[in-house]
Swiss-Prot record:
Role noted for this protein: O-methyltransferase that catalyzes the 2 O-methylation steps in the ubiquinone biosynthetic pathway.
GO molecular-function terms, A-Z: 2-polyprenyl-6-hydroxyphenol methylase activity; 3-demethylubiquinol 3-O-methyltransferase activity; polyprenyldihydroxybenzoate methyltransferase activity
Biological-process GO terms, alphabetical: methylation
Gene giving rise to this polypeptide: ubiG
Pathway of action: Cofactor biosynthesis; ubiquinone biosynthesis
SUPFAM superfamilies: S-adenosyl-L-methionine-dependent methyltransferases
Superkingdom per UniProt: Bacteria
Family: Belongs to the methyltransferase superfamily. UbiG/COQ3 family.
Stated name of the protein: Ubiquinone biosynthesis O-methyltransferase
Keyword Transmembrane: no
Catalysed reactions listed for this entry: a 3-demethylubiquinol + S-adenosyl-L-methionine = a ubiquinol + S-adenosyl-L-homocysteine + H(+); a 3-(all-trans-polyprenyl)benzene-1,2-diol + S-adenosyl-L-methionine = a 2-methoxy-6-(all-trans-polyprenyl)phenol + S-adenosyl-L-homocysteine + H(+)
Residues holding S-adenosyl-L-methionine: 41, 72, 93, 136
Organism from which the protein derives: Rhizobium meliloti (strain 1021) (Ensifer meliloti)
Keyword annotations from UniProtKB, A to Z: Methyltransferase, S-adenosyl-L-methionine, Transferase, Ubiquinone biosynthesis
Length: 248
């Protein structure tokens, strides 16, 4: 298959999330786990970006002046907080329904986000570039992980960062993130994740490094049921995040 024919889109995944689009901003609905997950990933992104670009993470708008791409933005759960922190945000998603929900919510919240129903490859082909690219809980839903990572890496400006968050392909992840989360605890609709589409860290890092990126940080993330919150961890066997930087 030629590279021009490659696509990152898995239409069945787009359809699955389009069908749930109306629930994006319901903290007790089908996206409840993402609402729970948002604080730890927002803090991690803010702190890493602030450290990298020499910003004060505790200031009101530490991302002011930075252009940020939230790829696979869904209803905007990350895009809106990024914009509130001062970033110039492009929220991109392959689902027109998701983008419609995101635009409506942003308008009602008074937050400015440039939402687009567009693919990563279309943005890259248009020559778009960003200081920060966010791939959060997306790679396990795309059709071609290597192509997706390469495409997104090309949009990171020199001196810029990419964040990736996903679920590891391990038996532990299958037990906790799929069986328990979807079938026992019912945190997610059944079928949200498929084991063979989960991605190991090395499968992300190889195409990033081949695209000239350098791995800057890695962290696991785990859910503490006693505190009812997500925390960073050294254990990357289930949920994890990777930060890559493009040298100047």
């Amino acid at each position: 298959m030629s590279e021009t024919a490659r696509t990152t889109i898995d239409q069945s995944e787009v359809d699955r999330f389009s069908a749930m689009a109306a629930e994006w901003w319901d903290p007790t609905g089908k996206f409840r786990p993402l609402h729970k997950f948002n604080p730890v990933r927002l803090t991690y992104i803010r702190d890493r970006v602030s450290e990298h670009f020499g910003r004060d993470a505790k200031s009101r708008q530490p991302l002011e002046g930075l252009r940020v791409l939230d790829i696979g933005c869904g209803g905007g759960l990350l895009s809106e907080p990024m914009a509130r922190m001062g970033a110039d945000v492009v929220g991109a998603d392959a689902s027109e329904k998701n983008i419609g929900i995101a635009r409506t919510h942003a308008a009602g919240s008074g937050v400015s986000v440039d939402y687009r129903a567009v693919t990563a490859e279309a943005l890259a082909e248009a020559g778009e570039s960003f200081d920060v690219v966010l791939n959060m809980e997306v790679v396990e839903h795309v059709a071609d992980v290597e192509f997706f990572m390469t495409t997104c890496a090309h949009m990171v400006r020199p001196g810029g960062l990419m964040f990736v968050a996903t679920i590891n392909r391990t038996l532990k992840a299958a037990a906790l993130a799929i069986f328990a989360a979807e079938n026992v605890l019912r945190w997610l609709p059944r079928g949200t994740h498929q084991y063979d589409k989960l991605v190991r860290p090395d499968e992300l890092e190889r195409p990033l490094e081949a695209s000239g990126m350098e791995i800057a940080d890695r962290t696991g993330v785990f859910f503490n049921p006693l505190a009812n919150q997500w925390n960073l961890s050294r254990d990357m066997d289930v949920n994890y995040m990777i930060v890559a930087k493009r040298p100047i």
